Amino acid sequence: NKNKVFIADTKYNRARYDAVGYRIDYSNFIEYEKKLERKKNWLINNLQVLQEHLEEMFHIDYSILSFEVEAVFFINTPTFYMFNGKYKALTLLRIKEYIENTWDYPIIKLEDKTNKRILKYSHPYFKNPIIISTE
């Protein structure tokens, strides 16, 4: 696994249980993506600044300059955006596991018995192409 620096935006959302609420949340997150994208791009272009800060503040003795920068949302309640967003949205219960690389969005496997194949869907579930295999 590649070492990562996470850049996150936190969102406190009301719990929504209807289609209109899901649409509103999704539309809001599409707007939030723009801000998170700017943060991610800034960090990618300024890893040296973060490196110097970490050396000064925490006396780290390793380089983060080759680390991957991953943008994520931290959220208080599940939302439809989690399944199809450009960035992963992690509920409070999953943040630690995700950062420690002990949990990730699962690959959903569906068996197509007619054609004797397995269809695999990965995050974002409705945007990514289906992976077809004969496992």
Segments from the language model and where they lie:
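Intrinsically disordered, low-complexity Ser/Thr/Pro/Gly-rich regulatory segments
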Residues: K2-E135
